UniProtKB/Swiss-Prot annotation:
Binding-site residues, tRNA: 14, 60, 62, 108
EC number(s) recorded for this UniProt protein: 3.1.1.29
Origin organism lineage: Bacteria, Bacillati, Mycoplasmatota, Mycoplasmoidales, Metamycoplasmataceae
Function summary: Hydrolyzes ribosome-free peptidyl-tRNAs (with 1 or more amino acids incorporated), which drop off the ribosome during protein synthesis, or as a result of ribosome stalling.
Organism: Metamycoplasma arthritidis (strain 158L3-1)
Residues the record marks as site: Discriminates between blocked and unblocked aminoacyl-tRNA: 9
The protein's name: Peptidyl-tRNA hydrolase
Membership in a protein family: Belongs to the PTH family.
Subcellular location: Cytoplasm
Positions annotated as active site in the UniProt record: 19 (proton acceptor)
Gene3D superfamilies, per database record: Peptidyl-tRNA hydrolase (3.40.50.1470)
Subunit structure: Monomer.
Length: 181
């Protein structure tokens, strides 16, 4: 069973902010597959079937690892079957990349997951949000209309790539999607 986790912050004040791109990706998958996150456990919400779990932590970003670790332990999911989607300030807006492993790159959500799981060997799909002058204000800020239109388009491909990860090896998905975002 695969586990896809979109990172973000809970609450309406954070909806459609740059830091919630992971939540937006999960929402896009739900829309494409006509499913909803109807289960609640371990301070998060998720959809589950025999092939995959699609999830959002309801903790704040820097506590995402607690939810991910609890879900993985409860459903006996190995780290090899986890993929995390989140924002990346080092990528230009409208760009995305799939990686098999890596450091946190300063992102507190993936940093907490790496610490809780005690490994950097976590598959991830990073979505570019660009960089602003003040990092905290920038990531917690909402997209401009022009940037939102770019993000809305890329989320389609991001959702397709994540769904492809459920049924295909990550190297196949990387070859197919990296460079096409």
């Amino acid at each position: 069973m695969k586990l896809i986790v979109g990172l973000g912050n809970p609450g309406t004040e954070y909806e459609k902010t740059r830091h919630n791109i992971g939540f937006m990706a999960v929402d896009k998958i739900c829309e494409k597959l006509n499913i909803s996150l109807n289960e609640k456990k371990f301070n998060g919400i998720f959809y589950r079937n025999k092939d995959f779990i699609l999830a959002k932590p309801l903790t704040y970003m820097n506590k995402s690892g607690d939810f991910v670790q609890a879900l993985m332990q409860y459903y006996d999911i190995s780290v090899e079957d986890l993929i995390v989607v989140y924002d990346d300030m080092d990528l230009l807006i409208g760009k995305a990349v799939i990686r098999q492993k890596g450091s946190s790159g300063g992102h507190n959500g993936i940093k907490d997951i790496i610490e809780k799981l005690k490994t950097e060997n976590i598959k991830r799909l990073k979505v570019g949000i660009g960089r602003g002058d003040n990092a905290i204000n920038f990531v917690l800020g909402k997209f401009s209309i022009a940037d939102y239109q770019i993000i809305d388009k890329i989320l389609d491909g991001v959702a397709d790539a994540l769904v492809s990860c459920i049924y295909n090896d990550v190297r196949f998905v990387m070859n197919k999607f990296n460079g096409s975002f």
